[in-house]
Amino acid sequence: KKDKLDLSMAAFILKNTLSDNGSVTRGICSVDGEHNVVEIEETYNIRREADGKVMAGEDDRKEVSEDSFVSMNMWGCPPEFFGVLETEFVKFLKKYGDMPKSEFLLPIVIDKLIKNGDADCKPLESHDKWFGVTYAEDKASVCEAIAKLIKDGVYPAKLWD
């Protein structure tokens, strides 16, 4: 299609985004031979087991590759994307608006656009460790990691004066 959206995403490596304190949800991305994202599967309850394997799901547990690309919701989108997002959000509200725990997930919208041929998406690989506080117990290690980045000069001590 001539009016396809050109998108990009920060593609983190799954093993660099796991929490030591519980399971996480990630958009696991499949990439084709031309380095295009062809699928984003929102995957729940991902955790590393005692045997070192990375597993996902509850009753229908499956092993997932710790080297998979995952979305951490850092996207590059043109301004036209926001009109598409608004249309999809209105559809979402009509279907799930009365369900308080429902979530409008960006990776699901982008996956639909890719599969319908309305968008191309390039993964921009990051091999850095993701620092996030999914659980209260994550806070200490995140603070330590950021302090180390500041000490090593990778990250500024102050963003603004």
Locate the predicted segments by residue.
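Conserved core of the sugar-phosphate nucleotidyltransferase
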Residues: 1-75
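Residue-level signal for inorganic ion chemistry
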Residues: 13, 78, 135
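Residue-level signal for well-ordered alpha-helical positions
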Residues: 21, 87-88, 145
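Glycine-rich loop/turn
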Residues: 56-63, 111-126
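Conserved nucleotide-sugar donor-binding
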Residues: 74-85
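Residues that recognize and position ribonucleotide moieties
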Residues: 74-75, 103, 132
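A C-terminal functional module that forms or caps the active site or interfaces directly
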Residues: 86-119
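Hydrophobic helical membrane-anchoring modules
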Residues: 115, 120, 128-161
